């Protein structure tokens, strides 16, 4: 099954219930599965049924991703003598948590008693927060990968003039890429402040 079809189905059934759609993909899939009865005969395992998850599982075999670690393991990895993950990955994760908090307030506001006529307004804000959160989560590993590319470039052979030229170009390309990633993080963090600002102004004050 295509991931988009499952997510769209989850949003559809949530909207029919006038519930916020700004929730995790995992929750949207769960709603779709329950509403469509896909688990009536046997358990529905998204990792084995959804095309994108199957391909991602195959592509990531043997690769350790930061975002798959527990919080404790992530902190321990950061504290280790390895130079990565560093400030860039940590900043991206902190930004993702900030976006998640904005979505939390939006979701709580969407379901606040007495605000029934505003559920869709807050649902839209929760969706925006989720988009920023998703992008920033991706940047957690992307920042560390960018750093590793620089290290790989520096390790290239440099005996002949051709090798030296190829190594220099690889270092320049990797360094340029490594500057683009934190810029993306800053841009996403800045833009997600719009959700935090809106929720501070119009969101549930008890949230």
Task: Please provide the spans of the model-predicted regions.
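Long, contiguous binding/interaction regions
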Residues: 1-69, 166, 170
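Amphipathic alpha-helix face/heptad-repeat signature
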Residues: 90-97, 125, 132-139, 174, ...
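Polytopic transmembrane helical bundles with strong interfacial aromatic enrichment
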Residues: 61-70, 76, 184, 188-195
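Conserved phosphate/anionic-ligand binding catalytic regions in large, soluble enzymes, centered on
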Residues: 1, 78-105, 206-207
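A structural-propensity feature for long, helix-poor, extended segments
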Residues: 111-157
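Amphipathic alpha-helical interface segments
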Residues: 143-207
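Short, hydrophobic/aliphatic alpha-helical segments
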Residues: 65-85, 201-205
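Inter-helical turn/loop segments and adjacent helix faces that build the functional surface
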Residues: 108-119, 199-207
